[in-house]
Curated annotation (Swiss-Prot):
Its main location: mitochondrion. Pfam families: COX2, COX2_TM. Binds a dinuclear copper A center per subunit. Mg(2+) binds at E219. GO terms for molecular function: copper ion binding; cytochrome-c oxidase activity. This is Cytochrome c oxidase subunit 2. It comes from Kluyveromyces lactis (strain ATCC 8585 / CBS 2359 / DSM 70799 / NBRC 1267 / NRRL Y-1140 / WM37). Cu cation A1 binds at H182, C217, C221, M228. GO terms for cellular component: mitochondrial inner membrane. The signal sequence of COX2 is processed by IMP1. It is a multi-pass membrane protein. InterPro entries: CcO_II (IPR045187), CcO_II-like_C (IPR002429), CcO_II_C (IPR034210), Copper_CuA (IPR001505), Cupredoxin (IPR008972), Cyt_c_oxidase_su2 (IPR014222), Cyt_c_oxidase_su2_TM_dom (IPR011759), Cyt_c_oxidase_su2_TM_sf (IPR036257).
């Protein structure tokens, strides 16, 4: 009981009526959360200011309908409401551009995983590792049907095989598709990238804690679009090497 009270419980799955992001597990997602919170601060200030101005104008006009009849323009107020929003937009845009660049930058990956979207499952290739038969480690990942789910497994999220990766390792995901456009998205890792036929897109992740992270195809791709979950297990390096030796 004492251990449970002193443990940090992370939310890495979608929750009913959820109103916020899943907990972050990578620096990129942490930056996205921080940017969102900062922007919301300015948005609430703008909402309050605009609401107050609207209320004041409506109240004043209702008391004296001809109060502003002969006012054609106000140079000072026009300058203010032109410059002030421009400054706010710059304050919001500058850090967002920095974050966008950092999310797009792939920094010296220690390993590469290729994710291929197909109707309606994912195929993964660990191109840096070769098994005893001289073949690249690869496997397919299918959603577990609802009637085969075990206790603790999640409907439309759990898969028969998981992508296993080590923590604190720069990982590059190379994403493509074999038929139609899919989308490789894992919210807790800050990953969302298109999987397009004939095109290779890449995104990086530095997972900073162990856990199981779920994602889904985020591009409508046909009848069973909802049956393309993504399950990534982040484990310690020794556990990853042990899993790799079993492949």
């Amino acid at each position: 009981m004492f251990y449970l009270l002193n443990s940090i419980i992370m939310n890495d799955v979608p929750t009913p009526y959820g109103m916020y992001f899943q907990d972050s597990a990578t620096p990129n997602q942490e930056g996205i959360l921080e940017l969102h919170d900062n922007i919301m601060f300015y948005l609430f200030i703008i909402l309050g200011l605009v609401s107050w101005l609207l209320f004041t104008i409506v109240r004043t006009y209702s008391k004296n309908p001809i109060a502003y009849k002969y006012i054609k323009h106000g140079q000072t107020i026009e300058i203010i409401w032109t410059i002030f929003p421009a400054v706010i937009l710059l304050i919001i845009a500058f850090p967002s551009f920095i974050l966008l660049y950092l999310c797009d930058e792939v920094i010296s990956p220690a390993m590469t995983i290729k994710a291929i979207g197909l109707q309606w499952y994912w195929k993964y290739e660990y191109s840096d590792f070769i098994n005893d038969n001289g073949e690249t480690v690869e496997f397919e990942s299918y959603v577990i049907p609802e009637d085969l789910l075990e206790d603790g497994q999640l409907r439309l999220l759990d898969t028969d095989t998981s992508v296993v990766v080590p923590v604190d390792t720069h990982i590059r995901f190379v994403v493509t598709a074999a038929d139609v456009i899919h989308d490789f998205a894992v919210p807790s890792l800050g990953i969302k990238i298109d999987a397009a036929p004939g095109r290779l897109n890449q995104v990086s992740a530095l997972i900073q804690r162990e856990g199981v992270f779920y994602g889904q195809c985020s591009e409508i791709c046909g009848q069973s679009h909802s049956a393309m979950p993504i399950k990534i297990e982040a484990v310690s390096l020794p556990a990853f090497l042990e899993w790799l030796n079993e492949q």
